[in-house]
Amino acid sequence: MKILYSLRRYFHVETLFNGTLALGGRDQESTGFAWWAGNARLINLSGKLLGAHVAHAGLIVFWAGAMNLFEVAHFVPEKPMYEQGLILLPHLATLGWGIGPGGEVINTFPYFVSGVLHLISSAVLGFGGVYHALIGPETLEESFPFFGYVWKDKNKMTTILGIHLILLGAGALLLVAKAIWFGGLYDTWAPGGGDVRKITNITLNPSTIFGYLLKSPFGGEGWIVSVDNMEDIVGGHVWLGIICIFGGIWHILTKPFAWARRAFVWSGEAYLSYSLAAISLMGFIACCFVWFNNTAYPSEFYGPTGPEASQAQAFSFLVRDQRLGANVGSAQGPTGLGKYLMRSPTGEIIFGGETMRFWDLRAPWLEPLRGPNGLDLSKLKKDIQPWQERRSAEYMTHAPLGSLNSVGGVATEINAVNYVSPRSWLSTSHFVLGFFFFVGHLWHAGRARAAAAGFEKGIDRDSEPVLYMEPLN
């Protein structure tokens, strides 16, 4: 019986399949992997793997540019961003481009520029990807030793890690630069309903910044997702940028300690599994951030959070009925609790009714009406501004409750707009992707550990039908 595939396929993934570095790299015979196994064919071909990664980056940046221009072309300035299904323009708006007071879009040209810049850079990346995939050297070790590597080379791997950390740190500091010097960021908490402003008084106190990391992740505490002011967000990026850059320098200058050499599996597939775990964690954190946080993800662009829409409904009816003569401080609801206002278990005055569960919501349209002990009755009677009424009515009818077939809105709200909020899309997609990336982490970690332990022999193929079929050609 003729064996049509490489038995090396079943041994430790770092084996060079033909004993030399001059690999074909495109067929099953030379790599032990079939065409559909994708980059697995390129495990030991650093030049070709570079091409695959650069081309992948080109595809990502092309999508960003094309989708950006698509959103600009379809954008209607009279409607809020979140009602138009936009997921990229809200991010640009949050960075302060083209935005005036109250989150109003006053200039779409910066969005057009962003799209064009991404398209142009995607062309450069695409050319580089095709060049390295088809023309450039198969391996970089000989011609460009700085860019070459062997997966088992622990020192080189931590050097590459260090370079990545420095780039991430520089990215964090770019946001800081935009906030302080280059026009500022959109701050939803700016007086009068939000505005773009330079963030000058940034929080650098380590007890404040790292205090977020030590908080409980549960209600009322909310871990890092509870950040509610731009000063802390920008200060956090300062700390993160500096830590990443110094960590990167450390990893470039040092070799892994003995405990690290023993603790980790040092192979390409192991690094893939570590990366997938990290991205999975980031996906889950992003899911919580976009769902609950209305400072980093301002409701003017992403739509209200769930608790915010619920509290807005209670507020809107309080405003309406107060105008009709209701005494909102003492009116009783059907359960004997306050109809409009009630006390929380700890004594604060909160909105009554079903929205009591969201009593710890903080939102820029509501906070001015609070006093030292929760909502302030005299402010509710005298100080409500028209912009607060308008915004609350808008949020009440745009709850982020929509199924993916677009049946949206609160079932009990007659005026709900039938749409799916970008908050729903972004949090759901990041949760689902975070989950699948975690499964990918488990899969590749298991394979990498088995290969390192020497018992990864693959699936037993002795009885596979393909072994006794005639080749197609």
Curated annotation (Swiss-Prot):
Keywords: Acetylation, Chlorophyll, Chloroplast, Chromophore, Manganese, Membrane, Metal-binding, Phosphoprotein, Photosynthesis, Photosystem II, Plastid, Thylakoid, Transmembrane, Transmembrane helix. Residues 1-14 form a propeptide. It is found in: Plastid, Chloroplast thylakoid membrane. The keyword Cell membrane does not apply. One of its GO terms (cellular component) is chloroplast thylakoid membrane. [CaMn4O5] cluster binds at residue 367. The modification N-acetylthreonine is found at residue 15. GO terms for biological process: photosynthetic electron transport in photosystem II. It holds the Pfam family PSII. GO terms for molecular function: chlorophyll binding; electron transporter, transferring electrons within the cyclic electron transport pathway of photosynthesis activity; metal ion binding. It is a multi-pass membrane protein. It comes from the Eukaryota. The modification Phosphothreonine is found at residue 15. The keyword Hydrolase does not apply. The chain crosses the membrane at residues 69-93, 134-155, 178-200, 255-275, 291-312, 447-471. Binds multiple chlorophylls and provides some of the ligands for the Ca-4Mn-5O cluster of the oxygen-evolving complex. It may also provide a ligand for a Cl- that is required for oxygen evolution. PSII binds additional chlorophylls, carotenoids and specific lipids. HAMAP family: PSII_PsbC_CP43. One of the components of the core complex of photosystem II (PSII). It binds chlorophyll and helps catalyze the primary light-induced photochemical processes of PSII. PSII is a light-driven water:plastoquinone oxidoreductase, using light energy to abstract electrons from H(2)O, generating O(2) and a proton gradient subsequently used for ATP formation. Belongs to the PsbB/PsbC family. PsbC subfamily. PSII is composed of 1 copy each of membrane proteins PsbA, PsbB, PsbC, PsbD, PsbE, PsbF, PsbH, PsbI, PsbJ, PsbK, PsbL, PsbM, PsbT, PsbX, PsbY, PsbZ, Psb30/Ycf12, at least 3 peripheral proteins of the oxygen-evolving complex and a large number of cofactors. It forms dimeric complexes. This is Photosystem II CP43 reaction center protein. The gene is psbC.
